[in-house]
């Protein structure tokens, strides 16, 4: 229980220098299902920090299940394109990571395990698409609807601060049968497409009587 309390960020840590949300984790030395069960019994979820430069080692960690569960519920689909400042107890400095392979218990949605991929400019992030300006499109206003082909798009970001929460696609133009492509996405500075620019995102469909 003492270790569990220590993994919960203090008020000072929440006000830390970074603008990124912060996660506290503890190093762990033992892997395997028996060790994972012991961690879960203590309110912790096992995880791995990996990726980044080739020379950087894979790290075994444990994270407070309740703290990570709150993040998952608050951010939902956007959690895997949210950059976190990860503090490993007993080590100087922090790492910028994104959650990956989050496994939930089916009955309760408790976090069974979660891995953390180190951020790099080469990392492909799947960012949710947000279709806007439908009210300015005459075809859509007259009863047509958008048939979405993709709900997210792969992008690379120059730095962690430029990772967007969502990508906007304007639907102001386009009539019946119009296809919106990756080229219609408004990319923020420092963000470039990893998905082909010609990839179809949505289709304007007129309802049949």
Regions found by a protein language model. Give the residues of each.
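Extended basic (Lys/Arg/His-rich) segments that typically form rRNA-contacting surfaces
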Residues: 2-209
């Amino acid at each position: 229980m003492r270790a569990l309390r220590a993994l919960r960020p203090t008020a000072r840590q929440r006000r830390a220098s970074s603008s990124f949300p912060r996660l506290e984790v503890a190093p762990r030395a033992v892997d395997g299902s028996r060790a994972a069960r012991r961690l879960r019994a203590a309110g912790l979820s096992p995880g791995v920090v990996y990726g980044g430069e080739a020379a950087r080692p894979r790290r075994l960690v444990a994270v407070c299940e309740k703290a990570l569960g709150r993040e998952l519920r608050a951010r939902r689909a956007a959690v895997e394109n949210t950059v976190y400042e990860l503090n490993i107890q007993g080590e100087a400095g922090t790492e910028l990571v994104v959650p990956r392979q989050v496994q939930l218990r089916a009955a309760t949605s408790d976090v069974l395990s979660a891995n953390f991929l180190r951020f790099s400019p080469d990392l492909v992030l799947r960012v949710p698409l947000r279709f806007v300006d439908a009210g300015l499109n005459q075809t859509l206003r007259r009863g047509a609807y958008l048939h979405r082909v993709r709900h997210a798009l792969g992008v690379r970001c120059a730095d962690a601060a430029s990772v967007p929460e969502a990508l906007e696609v304007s639907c102001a133009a386009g009539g019946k049968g119009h296809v919106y492509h990756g080229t219609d996405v408004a990319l923020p500075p420092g963000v470039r497409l990893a998905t082909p620019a010609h990839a179809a995102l949505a289709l304007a469909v007129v309802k049949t009587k």
